[in-house]
Regions:
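C-terminal alpha-helical "lid" subdomain
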Residues: 60-188
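The catalytic "switch" region of P-loop NTPases
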Residues: 1-67
C-alpha cells in the first residue's frame, strides 16, 4: 500500500505516530530550476525527468506535440507529478481534438490560478506566501502549514528548500505584494 499524504501532515505533532506505525518515505517535488531563477526557467535534469514520467502515462508524442506546450505544462506543475497529471487532464478536457495545444493548457492553467487566487484571498495567505518565496523555508505559522496542505508551496529535492507553486507567482495580488515587500525592504 502506497499513500501520499500532504507534506504538512508530516510536520504536525499529532502525526509523529505515523513513523512508528508505517515506514514513511517523503517524495519531494522535482527541482526544475535554481531558487534564484524565474518560475518558467529550467535548470538541471528535472524538466526531462518530468517529461519522461509523463510519457509513461500518456502517448506524449501524439497528445502533446509542441515543446512550448510541454514546457508550459511542466513549468506550471512546479515539478509535482500530481500537479502535472491534473493539468494534463484538465487540458485534455479543454482540447477540441486528440491533441493538447498551448491554448488548452493556458485555459486549464487559468482555471487553476483562479482557484488558487480565491483560496489565497479567502484565507489571507498572501503575506506568508511572499515570505516563503523570499526565504525558501517554512515557518511554524499555521498559515504556512495550510499553504503546504493545499499544495501552494512545495519542498524540493536536493538542498531541501521550499518554494511557492509557480502559478502563485502569476497571481496579481502576489505580484503586487512582492513589489510592496521589496519596496519596504529597500527603504528600511
Amino acid at each position: 500500500l502506497l499513500l501520499t499524504p500532504q507534506i504538512s501532515l508530516m510536520f504536525r505533532t499529532k502525526s509523529a505516530q505515523l513513523d512508528s506505525i508505517y515506514t514513511c518515505h517523503l517524495l519531494y517535488t522535482v527541482r526544475l530550476r535554481k531558487p534564484e531563477q524565474g518560475y518558467r526557467e529550467f535548470d538541471g535534469p528535472g524538466r526531462d525527468l518530468m517529461e519522461k514520467a509523463l510519457a509513461l502515462r500518456i502517448r506524449l508524442d501524439a497528445m502533446i506535440k509542441g515543446k512550448e506546450t510541454r514546457d508550459r505544462l511542466i513549468a506550471a506543475s512546479g515539478g509535482a507529478i500530481r500537479e502535472l497529471l491534473d493539468l494534463v487532464s484538465q487540458s485534455a478536457f479543454a482540447a477540441a481534438g486528440d491533441e493538447i495545444r498551448l491554448s488548452d493548457v493556458e485555459r486549464a492553467v487559468g482555471k487553476r490560478k483562479q482557484r488558487m487566487r480565491d483560496l489565497i484571498n479567502a484565507n489571507g495567505w498572501i503575506n506568508e506566501l511572499v515570505r516563503l518565496s523570499r526565504e525558501k523555508q517554512i515557518s511554524s505559522d499555521q498559515k504556512c502549514m495550510d499553504i503546504l496542505f493545499h499544495r501552494l508551496a512545495f519542498k524540493y529535492n536536493g538542498e531541501g528548500c521550499y518554494d511557492i507553486h509557480p502559478l502563485v507567482a502569476e497571481i496579481p495580488e502576489f505580484e503586487r505584494a512582492v513589489g510592496e515587500s521589496q519596496s519596504a525592504l529597500s527603504s528600511a
